[in-house]
Amino acid sequence: LCQFLEARQKSDLEPQLGSAFDLHGAGFSFCSSANMAKTTRTGLIAFEDGTIFRGRAFGAVATNVGEACFNTSMTGYQEILTDPSYFSQIVTMTAVQIGNYGICPDDVESDGPKVKGFIVREISPVASNWRSNTSIQDYLAEAGIPGIEGVDTRAITKKLRVSGALKACITTEDISEEEAVKRAQEFGGLIGVDFVKEVTAKAAYHWDPEMEQSTPFTVVGTDLRLNEDKTPKPRFKVAAMDFGAKFSIYRKLQHHGFDVHVFPATTSAAEIKAFKPDCVFLSNGPGDPGAVDYAHATVKELIEEYPTFGICLGHQIITHALGAKTFKLKFGHRGGNQPVKNLETGKVSITAQNHGFASTREELEKAGAIVTEINLNDETVEGLRLKDKPVFSVQYHPEAAPGPNDADPLFVDFYNMVAKHVG
């Protein structure tokens, strides 16, 4: 393989790629030669301030607008692409090379890519993974998502860090720089826009109890649905409100002893109550938490009656349900290396995060909530619980996917809280 890649780097084997060398027998899975060759198409990303970055195009021939952001994860690009929280965003990866393990159908976080565009330093010319069935190039092309490689992703990241999140236009079509800048400026942004309705479930459904068995690499370790003597634990019926949930969260809930029933974001409190759940879960999702006011009213009513756990947007919706507010971060927290301190235990965890809004600490405390965790980078709120109700939430992603598993015990905490409440 090393000799193969060395020769590929020298361009000596470009015409033969995927045909003259058959390394499948050695455990390598390569995409076709047509997809591995570097494209001659060009593309660009234009920011609202007129800044232009040009590079090589991959993925779909298309033009999209959205908010530009960056993610510092080294791996997990497939989970990032399919995370509904990225709906309406153009994502830049800070890792140098992306795509080297292809796309695996078992690792998706939704029914397809949700990003508006994807920007990387380099797309790997080889996708080597026995579990993958396609390359990232083909995957994005089929989904209609444009991508650009060969750009200075470090410069883009530094720009967003200094300027804050910017509206942008990504194109792999033949349009002028002036037109691209104009389209970026015309994008409405995220504030005040309800993107949840674009990604929530269309109807209520029962999470497939066999789903976990069909994804053996998602959950590792002891079966937490069993007691120490291997007898089954009680399974609690959870009403999961889908604001744009990642599949990994449902898998984690199931793995930790919950019978997961998913409901669209617009489901009323009366409909949830008629289902008679043991508890409520509030998922992640895209956009401005202040724009989903219908969910604020629903959750305000539900937390009066049911043990509730919220993640990411779900955490922010609890904030609004309590009468507190959220605000937009300068450039957000996106990556698998965010340090979070638990103010009650003093413990620091490294967490996976993906959010552009945060809860206002002063207003939460005035509303009677206890702020339990903060981000050590900027001291924004990362967790809360209520003093007199079985309700807690976190801003980060304890299910990871991708990222560290430091916060996985939160699912155990949720189970134990429900068990105590149900009696």
What are these regions (language model features)?
Residues Q3-L5, L13, L23:
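Short hydrophobic targeting helices and cationic amphipathic motifs
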Residues G18, G25-G27:
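Residue-identity detector for glycine
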Residues A37-A239, F243-A270, A274-F275, P289, ...:
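RNA-binding accessory domains that recognize and position tRNA/RNA substrates
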Residues M74, N354-S359, Y396-G403:
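Glycine-rich phosphate/pyrophosphate-binding beta-alpha loops
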Residues R235-A239, D259, P307, I350, ...:
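Residues that mark the start of a beta-strand
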Residues A274, D278-C279, S283-I350, G356-A358, ...:
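Cysteine-nucleophile active-site neighborhood
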Residues G346-K389:
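Catalytic beta-strand/loop cores that center a nucleophilic Ser/Cys/Thr
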